[in-house]
Every structure is written in structure tokens, then in C-alpha cells.
Curated annotation (Swiss-Prot):
GO cellular component, one term: nucleus
Transmembrane segments: none
Free-text function comment from the UniProt entry: May be a regulator of keratinocyte proliferation or differentiation.
Pfam family, one: HCR
Coiled coil: 82-314, 344-398, 498-691
Protein name: Coiled-coil alpha-helical rod protein 1
Region (Disordered): 62-82, 185-218
Subcellular location: Cytoplasm; Nucleus
Signal peptide positions on this chain: none
Keyword Cytoplasm: yes
Presence of the UniProt keyword Translocase in the record: no
A single GO BP: cell differentiation
Top-level taxon of origin: Eukaryota
Length: 782
């Protein structure tokens, strides 16, 4: 041992003793600050490889620091063992120590600078971690909200699809029912129209047969009139022969009655006989007057004969009695003359009696003929009235045909209205389909957004896991920095949260509510249109039933009128038969009629013929009009049948197109459901692959299980209707969100406790360093 020197310039031995290790934290090298706290997922493997390559450098740096700390102890021990060599090596040691101190001071300064930089970076990293935690919270909350919204949107989409499918089926069913009812009503109307047309054809054929029978009867009446004319000509010849015989007798008697007076009387008689039944009494009076005149003439003739006999007796008186032969001859001549005159008088009286009897008989025949003429005129008036009734019935039938045409036009208008209603219903269906397609497009966009958010979730989870690993690796270096960051966080306001996703979610919810309102409004509009179409169809059906009842009543009336016409025709035929029988009886009586009555009968027959010809021409004209109307009705009926066939073909084509459209829509919806199911399975598979579901089950199993059991019990005790599926899904999504928030809060609490512990350790280390520095400064000064 060397005695200590008295030189005060030497360094005391305590300076060379082993110093306790400083409690300063080991400062990380500068290359640790260059590692970013949060890296994108693409650079995670590269950063991990850099960490693996930089770990040997960290171990080398720690070994250097430990060797630097152990070096003063070895030096102290070398001075105690080799005291003899200490003096010789003091200068070198002092110089070396000074260099070492300078180097250490430089390193301390560099370490302080690096610590400040590390603090700044750690503060930034803490803020970034905080932002990442918030972003993770927001992302998880957004993911849960999007999942809940996706589930709700899926439920709403299913409900909308089911509602639209039900409404489409209901509309199609109503459309089919209306089509069937309208086609049935159309068929019934067509059948009624065809039956009415057949009835009209039958009535027209019966009228034609009646007209043919009447024409035959008219021909028979004309033939009978010809026979009557021939008989009248024969009777006229007989009368002329009788008149010539009477004139010869009158000439033979010697009394000449002027022919003019006779012709005048006959003319007067003819004129009187041609008059009506009111002048028959005057004719009878005139005949009585003529009979009295003839009686006076007979008396005058007898008086004249008596005078002539007296004159002859005076002329043929004998002058003497010697001429008896002459007297006898004259007496015999006078007797013969008297006998002839008596015979002629008897004959004349007989002829006069016969003439008076014939006159009386002819008067009776004239009266009977007049009565028959009046009865025939009455029958003719009745027939004319019946013909007018038939014409009126034909007119009524024509008006009925016009009414049927109007009803047909109304039915066509109703069919056009129904077509317009079907077109409007199809347009509304197209609008509904467009709305459904737009809602599907919106759902696809939301699904794409949800898929994008779900695709971002793994990257966020990777970043969060990397940040957690990095926090664990640099836990011993960020105590003070976390404390400063906490102080700054308390002093500074929080950064505004990211509201883009919340705004987008709010917009999506508003869009969903708006689409729900539009779909409900469209459903109500469709229901109103369907109800209106149903009411219109019911009103049209009632109107068509009323029209059918009216047509049936008109058909019954026409049948009754046809039956009455048939009865009238039978009565007319019976009357015609009676008239033919009376004509046959009259043929026998007309052999004794005179020329006057023949002419009157000819005139009457001519008048009847003209009237009947006019009636026949009128009936033929009406029959032609009826035929034309029938032809028009047949043409219109054929047109209606063609139109009905065309409408039937159109309805079949429309039904086929609707079936094809429904099949295509069903296939498209099935494909869409398969795609959605596949996307859902892919999303669930990605979630299971990333481990989110398993982590969530591990962290929140004990907390969620009682609530789930309580919910299951409540669901079992009070079952809900299927309409509450959307609310149930949203309620089920709430505990998942709360569980994620709980796990994040636990992680943040752990980080805060760790930061507080590190800050306390750094504070203690800084106090020790300050004490050491203050104790070392006086020694250095001494």
C-alpha cells in the first residue's frame, strides 16, 4: 500500500469506487422511433421482419450499457490490487475518464434529446392509439349498426317482397276474376243476342209464311172474283134476254113504254143501289111507287081493252039478220082475241109478280150483300188494324234491335273501359315493379356499403392487434409520455368524432323510411284502385244483369205479341174460311142478280183489289225493310261474333304474357334471393374466419348468456307475431354492441393503469437522477 500523497490535485479513491446503477430508463435507440405505430395491412409483415432484424441490435445495445455500468467496479478493484501502478497510470486514467465523462455527457444529452423526441412521438402515438381506439369503437359500433340495419333491411326486404308478391297475386286473382266474369257476361249477352236474333229470324220466317199464305188467299180471292165476273156476265145476258122479251111483249100488246124513262128508272135504281145502307129505304119506297104505277098501268090496260071490246062490238053489229055467219066469225074472233089478251094479261101479271118477287129477292140479296160488304169492310178494317199492329210490332222489334245495338255498343264501351282499367292496373303494376326494383337496387347499394365496411373490419382489426402488440413491446418506454399525453388530453378538447358514417347511416335510415312510406302509399293506391275496379265491375255486372232482365222481359213481350198475332191470324183464317163458304153460297145466288148489282160488285171488287194491292205492296215493302233490318242485324251479329273472337284471342294472349312475366319475375326473385343468401353466407364466413365471432363469444359469453336466457324466457312466455321480426333483430343487435363497448372500455382501463404506473416509475427515476447529479456536482467542483 502506498501512503497517500498530500497533493490536493489528486482524485479521491471514492471517485473510482463502483457507483450504483442509475435508475434512468434505458433510452431506446433512434431507430426505434422510426418504426411507425400504425401501419397499413400491406406493410405489417415488412415491419415485423424489421423488428426481428433490429432485435439483435437492441440486445447488443443493452450489453454495451451493462458493460459500461460494470467497468468502473473493475477499475476500482484494479486500483486496490495494483496500487503501485496507479500513480503511473493516473494521468492516462484521468484522461480516459474525462473522455468517458464527456462521452457520457454527450450520450446523456443525446439520450435526453431522443427521450424528448420519444415523448413527442409517444404522445402522438398515444393520441393515435386513442384515435384508433375511438375509430375501432366507432367502427365496431358502425359495424353492429350496419349489421342491425342489414338485418332490418333484410327483414324489410323480405316483408316488402312478400307484401308485393301477395299484392301481385291478389291483383292477378282479381284481374282473372274480372276477366272471367266479363267474359261470362259477354258470352251470356252474346247467347241472348243470338237467341233473340234466332227468334227474330223465326218471326220473320213466320211472317214470310203468313205473307205467302195471304198472297195465296189473295190469288184465290182474285180467281173467285173472276168467276163472279163470269157469273155476273151470264146473269147480265139473262137479264138482257128477259128485257128484250118484255119489250117484245109490250110491243105486241101495243103499248110502248119509252126506253128513256125505263133507263132513267134503272139508272136511278142503280145509283140508289150503289149508295150506302142509309138509302135502302128510299129504294124500297121507289120500288113501291113503281109497283103502284104498274098497277095503274094494268088497270088502264084493262080499261082500254074493255073500251076496245065495246068499240069492236059496236063496229061488228049486224045491219040485218041475214048475216049470222059474219057475226059468228066476229064473235069467235073476239073470243079468241079475248082469250089471247087474257092469256097475255095472265102472263104479264105472272111476269109482274115474278118481277116483284125477284125485285124483293134482289133487294134482300142486296141488303144481305150490303151487310156482308159492311162485315167484310169491318173485317178488312180489322185486318188492316192487325196489319198496322204487325207493322207496329215490327217497328217495336226494330226499336228493340236498335236498343240491342245500343246495349251492344254500351257493352263494347264497358269492355273498352275495362281494357283501360286493365291497362291502368298494368301500369300501376309496372310502377310497383319499378318501385320494388328501385328498392332492390337501394338494398344492393346498402349491401355493397355493408360489404365494404365488413371488408374494412379485418384491416382495422389487424391494425388494432398490431397496435396492441406494439404497446406491449414499448410498455416500459411510454410512462412519462402517456402521463403528458393524459395531461394534454385533459387540457385539450377532444377531436370531433367521425360523423361521416353516422351521417351516412342516418341518410340510409331516412331513405329506408322514405321507401317504406312510398311502398305503403303505393300499396294503399293499389288497394284503392283494386277496390275501385271491383266496384266498377260490380256496377257493370248489375247493369248487365238489369239489361239482361229487360231483354228477357222484351223477349217475353214479343213472344206474347207473336202468340196474339197467331191467334188473330187463326181468327182471320176462320173468317176467311167463312167468307169462302159465304162466297160459295153467293155463287148460287148471284145467278139471278142483275147488271146493276154486278157492276156495283165489280166496283166494290175493284176497290177491294186496289186496297188489297196497296196493303200487299205495303206489306211487301215492310217485309223488304224487315229483311234489310234482319240482314243488318245478321251482319252486326257476325261482326260482334268476330269481335268477340278477337277479344277472346287478345285476352288469351294477355293471359299468356302475364303468365310469362310472372314466371320471369319469380325466377329473377329466386336468383336474387340465392345471391343474397350467398352474400350473407360469405359475410358470416369472413366474420368467422377473422375470429370476431369467437372472440365476441369468449369475451361476452358470461355477460350475455343470462340476458339471452331471460329474453328467451320472455319470448317463450309471450310469443310475438311475425311482424315484430325486424324489432327483435334490432334488439338482439343491441347486446352485441354493448359487449364490444365493454371490451373496448376494459382495454382502455388497462392502458390507463399501465400508463399511470410507468409515469410513476419515470417520476421516481427522474428524482433519483436529480439527486445523483446534485451530489456529483460538488465533488467535481472539489
Amino acid at each position: 500500500m502506498f501512503p497517500p500523497s498530500g497533493s490536493t490535485g489528486l482524485i479521491p479513491p471514492s471517485h473510482f469506487q463502483a457507483r450504483p446503477l442509475s435508475t434512468l430508463p434505458r433510452m431506446a435507440p433512434t431507430w426505434l422511433s422510426d418504426i411507425p405505430l400504425v401501419q397499413p395491412p400491406g406493410h405489417q409483415d415488412v415491419s415485423e421482419r424489421q423488428l426481428d432484424t433490429q432485435r439483435p441490435q437492441v440486445t447488443m445495445w443493452e450489453r454495451d450499457v451493462s458493460s459500461d455500468r460494470q467497468e468502473p467496479g473493475r477499475r476500482g478493484r484494479s486500483w486496490g490490487l495494483e496500487g503501485s501502478q496507479a500513480l503511473s497510470q493516473q494521468a492516462e486514467v484521468i484522461a480516459r475518464q474525462l473522455q468517458e465523462l464527456r462521452r457520457l455527457e454527450e450520450e446523456v444529452r443525446l439520450l435526453r434529446e431522443t427521450s424528448l423526441q420519444q415523448k413527442m412521438r409517444l404522445e402522438a402515438q398515444a393520441m393515435e392509439l386513442e384515435a384508433l381506439a375511438r375509430a375501432e369503437k366507432a367502427g365496431r359500433a358502425e359495424a353492429e349498426g350496419l349489421r342491425a340495419a342489414l338485418a332490418g333491411a333484410e327483414v324489410v326486404r323480405k316483408n316488402l317482397e312478400e307484401g308485393s308478391q301477395r299484392e301481385l297475386e291478389e291483383v292477378q286473382r282479381l284481374h282473372q276474376e274480372q276477366l272471367s266474369s266479363l267474359t261470362q257476361a259477354h258470352k251470356e249477352a252474346l247467347s241472348s243476342l243470338t237467341s233473340k236474333a234466332e227468334g227474330l229470324e223465326k218471326s220473320l220466317s213466320s211472317l214470310e209464311t203468313r205473307r205467302a199464305g195471304e198472297a195465296k188467299e189473295l190469288a184465290e180471292a182474285q180467281r173467285e172474283a173472276e168467276l163472279l165476273r163470269k157469273q155476273l156476265s151470264k146473269t147480265q145476258e139473262d137479264l138482257e134476254a128477259q128485257v128484250t122479251l118484255v119489250e117484245n111483249l109490250r110491243k105486241y100488246v101495243g103499248e110502248q113504254v119509252p126506253s128513256e124513262v125505263h133507263s132513267q128508272t134503272w139508272e136511278l135504281e142503280r145509283q140508289k143501289l150503289l149508295e150506302t145502307m142509309q138509302h135502302l129505304q128510299e129504294d124500297r119506297d121507289s120500288l113501291q111507287a113503281t109497283a103502284e104505277l104498274l098497277q095503274v098501268r094494268v088497270q088502264s090496260l084493262t080499261h082500254i081493252l074493255a073500251l076496245q071490246e065495246e068499240e069492236l062490238t059496236r063496229k061488228v053489229q049486224p045491219s040485218d039478220s041475214l048475216e049470222p055467219e059474219f057475226t059468228r066469225k066476229c064473235q069467235s074472233l073476239l073470243n079468241r082475241w079475248r082469250e089471247k089478251v087474257f092469256a097475255l094479261m095472265v102472263q104479264l101479271k105472272a111476269q109482274e109478280l115474278e118481277h116483284s118477287d125477284s125485285v124483293k129477292q134482289l133487294k134482300g140479296q142486296v141488303a144481305s150483300l150490303q151487310e156482308k160488304v159492311t162485315s167484310q169492310s169491318q173485317e178488312q178494317a180489322i185486318l188492316q188494324q192487325s196489319l198496322q199492329d204487325k207493322a207496329a210490332e215490327v217497328e217495336v222489334e226494330r226499336m228493340g234491335a236498335k236498343g240491342l245495338q245500343l246495349e251492344l255498343s254500351r257493352a263494347q264501351e264497358a269492355r273498352c273501359r275495362w281494357q283501360q282499367q286493365t291497362a291502368s292496373a298494368e301500369e300501376q303494376l309496372r310502377l310497383v315493379v319499378n318501385a320494388v326494383s328501385s328498392s332492390q337496387i337501394w338494398l344492393e347499394t346498402t349491401m355493397a356499403k355493408v360489404e365494404g365496411a365488413a371488408a374494412q373490419l379485418p384491416s382495422l382489426n389487424n391494425r388494432l392487434s398490431y397496435a396492441v402488440r406494439k404497446v406491449h413491446t414499448i410498455r416500459g418506454l411510454i410512462a412519462q409520455k402517456l402521463a403528458l399525453a393524459q395531461l394534454r388530453q385533459e387540457s385539450c378538447p377532444l377531436p370531433p368524432p367521425v360523423t361521416d358514417v353516422s351521417l351516412e347511416l342516418q341518410q340510409l335510415r331516412e331513405e329506408r323510411n322514405r321507401l317504406d312510406a312510398e311502398l305503403q302509399l303505393s300499396a294503399r293506391l293499389i288497394q284503392q284502385e283494386v277496390g275501385r275496379a271491383r266496384e266498377q265491375g260490380e256496377a257493370e255486372r248489375q247493369q248487365l244483369s238489369k239489361v239482361a232482365q229487360q231483354l228477357e222481359q222484351e223477349l217475353q213481350q214479343t213472344q206474347e205479341s207473336l202468340a196474339s198475332l197467331g191467334l188473330q191470324l187463326e181468327v182471320a183464317r176462320q173468317g176467311q174460311q167463312e167468307s169462302t163458304e159465304e162466297a160459295a153460297s153467293l155463287r148460287q145466288e148471284l145467278t139471278q142478280q142483275q147488271e146493276l148489282y154486278g157492276q156495283a160488285l165489280q166496283e166494290k171488287v175493284a176497290e177491294v183489289e186496289t186496297r188489297l194491292r196497296e196493303q200487299l205492296s205495303d206489306t211487301e215493302r215492310r217485309l223488304n225493310e224487315a229483311r234489310r233490318e234482319h240482314a243488318k242485324a245478321v251482319v252486326s251479329l257476325r261482326q260482334i261474333q268476330r269481335r268477340a273472337a278477337q277479344e277472346k284471342e287478345r285476352s288469351q294472349e294477355l293471359r299468356r304474357l302475364q303468365e310469362e312475366a310472372r314466371k320471369e319475375e319469380g325466377q329473377r326473385l329466386a336468383r336474387r334471393l340465392q345471391e343474397l343468401e350467398r352474400d350473407k353466407n360469405l359475410m358470416l364466413a369472413t366474420l368467422q374466419q377473422e375470429g370476431l365471432l369467437s372472440r365476441y363469444k369468449q369475451q361476452r359469453l358470461l355477460t350475455v348468456l343470462p340476458s339471452l336466457l331471460d329474453k328467451k324466457k320472455s319470448v317463450v312466455s309471450s310469443p310475438r307475431p311475425p311482424e315484430c321480426s325486424a324489432s327483435a333483430s334490432v334488439a338482439a343487435a343491441v347486446p352485441t354492441r354493448e359487449s364490444i363497448k365493454g371490451s373496448l372500455s376494459v382495454l382502455l382501463d388497462d392502458l390507463q393503469g399501465l400508463s399511470e404506473a410507468i409515469s410513476k416509475e419515470e417520476a421516481v427515476c427522474q428524482g433519483d437522477n436529480l439527486d445523483r447529479c446534485s451530489s456529483s456536482n460538488p465533488q467535481m467542483s472539489s
